[in-house]
Design a protein with these regions (language model features):
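Structured beta-strand/loop patches that form or line metal/cofactor-binding pockets in enzymes
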Residues: 1-54, 335-342, 390-401
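C-terminal extensions of enzymes
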Residues: 335-401
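Metal- or metallocofactor-binding catalytic centers and their adjacent structured scaffolds
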Residues: 2, 35-37, 41-120, 396-401
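Conserved N-terminal beta1-alpha1 strand-loop-helix module at the mouth
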Residues: 28-30, 111, 119, 182
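Conserved, mostly hydrophobic/aromatic
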Residues: 33, 39, 109, 122, ...
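Metal-dependent enolase-superfamily TIM-barrel catalytic cores that perform enediolate-based chemistry
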Residues: 123-245
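Shared catalytic-loop signature of beta/alpha-barrel
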Residues: 234-240, 244-248, 256-355, 359-363
Length: 401
């Protein structure tokens, strides 16, 4: 029986864990969706995190089961793909396909549809997102983008500095000990010099009482930025901290929707946005947030969710190549986390230079391989309008805290 859609719940054990104040992760938790229409397939991904958008793998799976996909397939069959792509770019995915739901549901469906359209049209990922073409008389942009490196709580500063360079931008995940964090900042600053930005990501772990002394201590140690220092949506307190801290503030968990972006600007709560494809509702909506940041003089980072497993990786990288003025770009660590991946070809980072080059197309440039099969959980047959469980042997799932 042919499948119009096949959903995978990928909870793949990680070779190396990743720890920060909001979560400790030892396995991926992504939903990967394959849509097939008239013999062409596209794959999409989301990576829901309850502490970011309030969504979980279970809630997005349930929302997908409730979402009627008839209009999605009707438009894919009935509208010329180039015209449909232009409508989606102009009006937004949710509007064109009449989909309601959380940001990760929208991301899952949008990335799958964009990948399918890219394959039909022979377009690469950056072209799908409307990336600007070459400007007459301008020098071509460099082929590679530098990426940041993250010092999380599972590795010492000494090992990080010895093994993770060269460094273009360093993010340090905060601990529950501000003195330890300041020591890490001092060690990184001494190693990289003054030309490399250093940011501490507090992941909402500071309080209004501790935020200012913590910020001053990190500033004096050599930090340039602090990311999401206070509980999500602490707009007034963020504005007050920004005025006195002597550090620039980047928002992440507080910045999920266009409404969040507008509030952040009105409250003068930040200097930079952390843009992530899954939490922001897909690459096209993420691009709109980048436009909002530019209009208001706010910097932006292209970030990742920890342990992305497939098309979400290349969607974020495509966004970065469309918006080269990003403060920094995160590449993720799929090469370190997963000896075997569910997609081919696997995403690549040049670890000798810590740079990225664009992924080859069409679409997001990858397909599901045999390693994906055990993670399949639901199928939507062409002959049926309802999802059916997939009966496959399940891999051992390791808890991710």
């Amino acid at each position: 029986m042919a499948e119009a859609a096949l959903l995978h719940r990928v909870r793949q054990p990680m070779h190396a864990r990743f720890d920060h104040p909001a979560a400790r992760r030892a396995a991926s938790d992504s939903l990967v969706l394959r849509l097939t229409c008239e013999g062409v397939s596209g794959i999409g991904e989301c990576a829901p995190r309850t502490y970011v958008t309030g969504e979980s793998g279970e809630s997005v799976l349930a929302a997908l089961r409730r979402t009627p996909l008839e209009r999605v397939f009707a438009l894919l069959r009935g509208e010329p793909p180039a015209e449909l792509l232009e409508r989606v770019r102009r009006e937004g995915f949710a509007t064109v396909f009449e989909i309601t739901g959380g940001n990760n549901l929208l991301c899952l469906l949008e990335t799958a549809v964009l990948d399918l359209l890219g394959r039909r049209l022979g377009l690469g990922a950056a072209e799908l997102l409307g990336g600007a073409g070459p400007v007459a008389g301008a020098a071509p942009p460099p082929a590679a983008l530098p990426v940041s490196q993250v010092l999380d709580l599972s590795i010492t500063a000494e090992e990080f500095l010895a093994t993770r360079g060269p460094f273009h931008f360093v993010k340090i995940k905060a601990s529950d000990d501000i003195l330890r964090d300041a020591r890490s900042v001092r060690a990184v600053r001494a190693h990289v010099g003054d030309g490399v930005p250093v940011m501490v990501d507090a992941n909402m772990s500071w309080t209004e009482a501790t935020a200012l002394p913590h910020a001053w201590r990190l500033r004096d140690a050599g930090a340039d930025y602090v990311e999401e220092p206070l509980p999500k949506g602490s707009w007034a307190a963020l504005g007050a901290l920004r005025r006195r801290a002597g550090l620039k503030i980047m928002l992440d968990e507080s910045l999920c929707t266009p409404e969040d972006a507008r509030t952040a600007v009105e409250a003068r709560a930040c200097d930079a946005f952390n843009i992530r494809v899954a939490k922001n509702g897909g690459p096209l909506r993420a691009a709109r947030l980048i436009g909002h940041a530019r209009r208001h003089g706010i910097a932006f980072q292209i970030g990742v969710q920890v342990a992305e497993v497939g098309p979400l990786i290349n969607a974020g990288r495509a966004l970065a190549f469309c918006h080269r003025d990003a403060l920094t770009v995160e590449a993720g660590q799929s090469d370190r986390f997963f000896p075997e991946m569910i997609v081919s070809p696997r995403p690549v980072v040049d670890r000798r230079a810590n740079t990225l080059v664009p992924a080859p197309g069409p679409g997001f440039g990858m397909s599901l391989n045999d390693a994906a099969e055990p993670w399949a959980v639901l199928a939507l047959p062409e002959e049926s309008g309802s999802w059916q469980p997939v009966d496959t042997p399940r891999p051992t799932v390791h808890a991710s805290l």
